[in-house]
Amino acid sequence: MDGPSTPGSRPPDYSLPSYDDHDDSPPPGHHQNINPAAIRLLTSVEGDPYDARPYVPRSPDKPSSPEHTVKPSTPSDADLYPEPLALKKDAKSTCATPEHLDALKRQEAGRVPPSPAPIDAQTAPSTHHSYQELPKPKLKPARASTVKLQKKSHSQPNLPRCAGVRASLPVIPEGPSARKSALQKSSTSCLSTPQTCPNKENSGSQSDISSAQPTQRRSYQPSIMSDYSRHDTILDPPAMPPPDSTYVPFQGRERRTPSPTRSSPTRPWSRMSNDYTRPPPSTMYEPSDLNGSPRPGTPSSRYGGSPRRPLPPAPLFSNSARDSQASFADDVTVSIPLDHDPDDVFGPETDISDNRYRKNSYVSQDTLHDDREDDYVHDDNEENDQQGHYGPAPDGKQERRGVRAPQMSRKEVQLINGELVLECKIPTILYSFLPRRDEVEFTHMRYTAVTCDPDDFVDRGYKLRQTIGRTARETELFICVTMYNETEIDFTRTMHAVMKNVAHFCSRKKSRTWGELGWQKIVVCIVSDGREKIHPRTLDALAAMGVYQDGIAKNFVNQKAVQAHVYEYTTQVSLDADLKFKGAEKGIVPCQMIFCLKEKNQRKLNSHRWFFNAFGKSLNPNVCILLDVGTRPGGDSLYHLWKAFDNDSNVAGACGEIKAMKGKFGRNLLNPLVASQNFEYKMSNILDKPLESVFGYITVLPGALSAYRYHALQNDETGHGPLSQYFKGETLHGQHADVFTANMYLAEDRILCWELVAKRDERWVLKYVKGCHGETDVPDSVPEFISQRRRWLNGAFFAAVYSLVHFKQVWTTDHTLARKILLNIESFYQLLQLLFTYFSLANFYLTFYFVAGGLADPKVDPFGNNAGFWIFTVLRYTCALLIATQFILSLGNRPQGANRLYLASMIIFVIIMMYTSFATIWIVIYQFSNDNIHLGSNVFTNIIVSVLSTLGLYVFMSLMYLEPWHLITSFVQYYLLLPFSICTLQVYAFCNTHDVTWGTKGDNVMKTDLGGAIGKRGGTTVELEIPSEQLDIDSGYDEALRNLRDRVEVHSPPPSESQLQEDYYRSVRTYMGRDLDGCQCHPRHGRQRSLFEHRHW
């Protein structure tokens, strides 16, 4: 737009005048602040380029004649400091001719000396020759008016009047002025004898001023110049930071030795200082921190945003001396310092006349490396000695530099339907990189303080965003993610997988239900059980996604205790398991999220009551999916789960395949506990779930990955139904909460499955979806594994008893006769399985007794010398004593307090199982080496057929499913840990049927740490403390990001002294009981009868 420009066609620091037809001068008092981000709007430019002729540099040893100086026609700031070589166009100005260009070239070469012509008062002094010597130029057509951002005057130029004004100006004398002569003389003297030049510490007199290049004469020089009233010139040298500065200047240019006749161009903002002091941070730019990163901003930042937002890097040769006075007015003349500063040039101990704006020459920069450098270092050492030591470092946690603590202010807020509902702006950084900002759901987070029971959520008038305003939508899929105290890694693993599944729904373009806007039909609800139990880093992850903001929640509203804090936001970013942001560039689509943070810890069943009875009743979804934090569903698992309901209208519930998380390259399988659970999960998904799906009744839909049809869960007109039975265990208190019911509701998902299938006058079935799979983290330590299985075994046992007792309900349903018969067959199968589980401990001991005792026979003894008999005798008494020890441990010790005892028991059981397996293999080999093999043989039937019917079934079904890898990686671990699972887990579960508490004691006290909303004006408004401004919201967001980036660990509180002492006393009691029991055992003398002697057993 400015026309072609070639290197060297313009002088350094040359800038075109404003795009206008007239001379624009700002109004009085207008700040001409140099803004690097300023934008000039230009719509049309006609005519030749403004700066058409090339720039010819002048000879530095010859001062320019006064005829060459152009004076502006309007008194403004530019009059005080005219721009070098910036020519103003006028209506009568002449253009450059070939003759004129030739004369300039000859003048540069020294062939033709300059011959200034006399100045006529009626002609514009804009050329080097008189108007009569040049040919008459060809007039150009008038330019069209340009559009600009500043307001301009519409008056046309009056050329005769301008000529009269120029005629009234005083005649400029020829030759250099006295001030310029002094400058040149000072520069010459410093170059000739640098040692004799004055060298003051903070000198600001004109004697120190030297210039490497002559400039135009200034008509006015103020006594004290403010930073904003001064225009930059080419005389400003580049700033050289002191050695202790962390900002490294630009090194791209070739640094040359300055001379009076040659000087490298500088930046218009460059300033320099001879002081070895760190410049104060500016409001616009700040130097890098100790790590080389941009220093966070301050509240006085020009961005007005977060104090932790990184500012842009400083410009080339930047210095903060100019910006240090930004708080003063533009027309300031004398600044009154608030505190005494020895470096303040306007301080009380300095003379104002000697501290004008300094322009140091290049010579002063070069002398930094000569003999005077020692003087500087000596002065700095003396100054440090005078100041003394700063003292010892402060103790304790220090406030991070540049951080602005969030400030709270009391504000009066209008209540909505008598309840506290706030619309909070999202942090500025999060808003800056959002792809969509067109709706309030993207720009504001909605907070609701719920003060009622979840069953009364809708009746009390609470609303969700999906039911009000422009965001009112139909919900097809409602996803529940329950959480307790899981870490941010577990949360982000699950949440990122859910958001990828939402993106998969939107990618199905041909679907009649889904498509590009499919995310509007999906709502994700996160329910956290207990505000004081949630992991702080998990809150930081939610805050990073924009769902949560600290400082908004309150404990009570109008003297009513808050039961749950509900946050609503449609996020467009996700955090993966590595805590890295993923957005639209990775295929992430918007996701409607509801975060329900319960005030009290009331167990998982209460979380589901909030999900179904509060939020589900408000949204009325079609399908509800239940997930646990830590479970990672596959990329399209949720779609396959939803598709099962879409294909069959009789499906009331469905589940997918749960896999144990094996880690990278399967390294988690090196832990025997993880490997055994992996084999157990795989065989359950291969044998149990498909068989139960054929019958139509799956005994348990795992809460880690399952789905239900919301319509099928509803109660009938009398209030009886699946949900009423499901939440019955939460409302049982006192004498009504019997032990049987309390343990049964430890596995409440089993009760829900039975109530769905046996619902009166309905024909609902449950289905297993093979295409849906999810990975979950399994316990990897013995105490955690025992505690988890205690709830599972007790819940499964009592729920199976419940379904067997109420099996007659099947005949009241609307199922077909064939389906009813199949359900009764399945009930009989469950009865057999229940009996086998109940007597599994005796079955294990009998198996060990007869199989391992088979090696006690001298005919089969592989060791000889009757060694098999003695080995079996030792293991027999060890096994009996170990089983008795499990009862003592289960009745008196916690798994966390008796970790060593349980670990020792597991090792001994593994040894016993290894010897039993060896005995089995040896007996099978011995039988095949004998010719008397027939099917009626007791040994052949009891050993070989039983082994083939169990292990062979595992191998055959795994090969049929084309998934045999768990047989290779996990079968051995599972087989060896079978005695530990049968004896230890089974005994501990039945010995702790009284333990049905979830640690909710003392949660009935209302907390006041968050503050409250106090009612005003008859209860229509409340007064509460909230963040005072946007900067406080940004500070909390930056704090959350820093915690996630630094991976700040949250240490769990150690066990109390009383708990440790109690565990110690219980361990001593267990040792005494074990020793007493062992001392009463006496071995029976005599030869052990082997299995081969019991021919008719």
Swiss-Prot record:
GO process terms (BP): chitin biosynthetic process; mitotic actomyosin contractile ring contraction
Bias (Basic and acidic residues): 59-70, 99-109
Location within or outside the cell: Cell membrane
Entry's EC annotation: 2.4.1.16
Chief subcellular location: membrane
Alphabetical list of CDD domains matching this protein: Chitin_synth_C (cd04190)
EC class name: transferase
Compositional bias annotation for Acidic residues: 372-385
This protein's name: Chitin synthase 2
A single GO molecular function term of this UniProt record: chitin synthase activity
Catalytic reaction annotation: [(1->4)-N-acetyl-beta-D-glucosaminyl](n) + UDP-N-acetyl-alpha-D-glucosamine = [(1->4)-N-acetyl-beta-D-glucosaminyl](n+1) + UDP + H(+)
Biased composition (Polar residues): 183-226, 317-327
Annotated transmembrane regions: 792-812, 834-854, 869-889, 906-926, 939-959, 965-985
Membrane topology: Multi-pass membrane protein
GO cellular component, one term: cellular bud neck
Any Pfam family matching the protein: Chitin_synth_1N
Role according to the record: Polymerizes chitin, a structural polymer of the cell wall and septum, by transferring the sugar moiety of UDP-GlcNAc to the non-reducing end of the growing chitin polymer. Plays a role in cell wall integrity. Plays a key role in pathogenicity. Likely contributes to post-penetration virulence.
Organism: Verticillium dahliae (strain VdLs.17 / ATCC MYA-4575 / FGSC 10137)
Lineage: Eukaryota, Fungi, Dikarya, Ascomycota, Pezizomycotina
Chain residue ranges for the region called Disordered: 1-407
Glycosylation sites: N485, N647
Compositional bias per record (Low complexity), positions renumbered to this chain: 258-271
Description of the deletion phenotype: Exhibits a significant reduced pathogenicity in Arabidopsis and cotton plants.
Family recorded in the similarity comment: Belongs to the chitin synthase family. Class II subfamily.
Keywords recorded for this protein, A-Z: Cell membrane, Glycoprotein, Glycosyltransferase, Membrane, Transferase, Transmembrane, Transmembrane helix, Virulence
